[in-house]
Amino acid sequence: MGDSIRIVKTTSENPDFLSLIKTFDVYLWDRYPELKTNYWGNNIIELNRNVVVIYLDEKPVACGCFKKYDKNTIEIKRMFVAPEARGLGLAQRILQELEQWSLELGYSISILETLYKQQEAISLYQKVGYEIVDNYEPYVGLENSICMRKQIVRIDL
């Protein structure tokens, strides 16, 4: 792979986003089949206008989106980097893009949920300023969930 990176703001109807999400779901359920029953409904993305897809040499390799949680808060959803593109800092780029986009829309707080078994994801989120908090709805009572929160600040991308 070369190093041509293109970041696209799009919607959940984008075919490349949908393809990445299908790959992500297969990855999750292959890795954690025991969790599928409790978590499937929380990962369905309805029409969403706040989606980012990253292309590496014109191939879609990473994605993420956010949705409104409350008047000040967005929830980061469906963060995924394809295995062949990991280690290139793309997950951080997605988070930065989503956070800055949410600031432009007037939000100041970002929350997210990940599985406690996703230690690499937890480490990434902590590295970029997220802190573990009590589980928020709809994750209250789900022992496998780790919820995190961050005050968003403007950065120059």
Regions found by a protein language model. Name each.
Residues 69, 99, 113-115:
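Conserved acidic functional residues
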Residues 13, 108-110, 115-128, 134-157:
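C-terminal "cap" of GNAT-fold acetyltransferases
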Residues 81, 87-100, 127:
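Conserved acetyl-CoA-binding loop-helix of GNAT-fold acetyltransferases
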